[in-house]
């Protein structure tokens, strides 16, 4: 696919192309400039040269798909949960980074997505909309081009994308629901750790208890985050005395050979189709509870 073609919607009535790209698609200045320089925007199948022309309901707008530079491929077959022309949802395995932090890292989830895109003959990029810790398994959302990443990133920044995690923790709970509203900051004494700190960034986690196992003194909980701080769920659960099983960095028991945290559900609005979308992926065979 080389173009995105869609009708002018009612709430776009009278807007110029610049306004639509900026206010509806949330495209930055650089991406808008790339589209302008392509000279490949069509209105009703004819070139649109004047970007100050008001657009009206019933017209058809066609925009060129602008891509980022491709990243190296990693020959790993991911579980694809959903895919269309603009986005892709995968079930990331535990132990795999979401994307590279350095140029030499090519065995990440993003590199595996790029491998899938090229293997299936797609002119697209693997652009992670959010990230999961290397030690966390579950759903990760990828955009395929600059048009898609702009709208999805805007949703992330405005908390319109909701993620739900499954965690197996030490100890049993008396409460069914609990909200943890405690700021998280760096641990000055341990570079890879975070801690609850009055000087940290705001962080809110909602916890729902699904099951108590009194015999083994463990619980299964569901967590929804309003913010996306590093190690947020791990720090918050540890901070109230229920560290995640396998998370020895934050005081969890070593009864599992992985951290028992899985991104189970994902909710978003499609950036172009305008519909709500819900995805889920069960935890893998290495899940212990």
Annotate each language-model stretch with its function.
Residues 95-115, 149-154, 166-220, 235, ...:
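Glycine- and acidic-residue-rich catalytic/RNA-contacting loop of pseudouridine synthases
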Residues 1-179, 260, 288:
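RNA pseudouridine synthases
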Residues 39-43, 184, 266-268:
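Short polybasic amphipathic segments
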Residues 48, 68, 94-95, 103, ...:
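Residue-level signature for short turns and capping positions that connect secondary-structure elements
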Residues 1-34, 201-204, 209-220, 226-289:
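Pseudouridine synthases involved in rRNA/tRNA modification
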Residues 80-81, 129, 184, 207-210, ...:
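A structural signal for short hydrophobic beta-strand segments in well-ordered beta-sheet cores
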Residues 24, 116, 159, 187-190, ...:
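Conserved, well-folded catalytic cores of nucleic-acid-processing
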Residues 73-74, 150-152, 190-194, 245, ...:
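A short, acidic/glycine-rich surface segment
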């Amino acid at each position: 696919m080389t173009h995105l073609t869609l009708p002018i919607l009612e709430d776009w009535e009278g807007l110029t192309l610049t306004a639509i790209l900026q206010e509806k698609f949330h495209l930055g200045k650089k991406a808008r400039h790339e589209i302008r320089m392509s000279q490949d925007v069509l209105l009703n199948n004819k070139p649109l040269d004047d970007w100050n022309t008001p657009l009206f309901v019933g017209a058809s707008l066609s925009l060129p798909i602008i891509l980022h530079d491709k990243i190296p491929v990693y020959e790993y077959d991911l579980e694809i949960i959903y895919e269309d022309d603009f986005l892709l949802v995968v079930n990331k395995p535990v132990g795999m980074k979401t994307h590279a932090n350095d140029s030499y890292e090519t065995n990440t989830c993003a590199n595996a997505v790029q491998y899938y895109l090229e293997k299936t003959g797609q002119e697209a990029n693997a652009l992670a909309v959010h990230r999961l810790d290397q030690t966390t398994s579950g759903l990760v959302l990828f955009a395929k081009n600059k048009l898609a990443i702009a709208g999805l990133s805007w949703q992330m920044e405005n908390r319109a994308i909701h993620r739900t995690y499954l965690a197996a923790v030490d100890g049993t709970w008396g409460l069914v629901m609990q909200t943890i509203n405690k700021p998280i900051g760096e641990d000055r004494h341990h570079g890879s750790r975070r801690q609850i700190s009055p000087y940290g960034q705001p962080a809110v986690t909602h916890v729902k208890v699904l099951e108590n196992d009194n015999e083994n003194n463990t619980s299964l909980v569901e967590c929804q985050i309003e913010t996306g701080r590093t190690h947020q769920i791990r720090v918050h659960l540890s901070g109230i005395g229920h560290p995640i099983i396998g998370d020895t960095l934050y005081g969890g028991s070593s009864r599992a050979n992985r951290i028992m945290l899985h991104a189970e559900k994902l909710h978003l609005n499609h950036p172009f189709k305008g519909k709500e979308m819900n995805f889920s992926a069960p935890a893998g065979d290495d899940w212990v509870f």
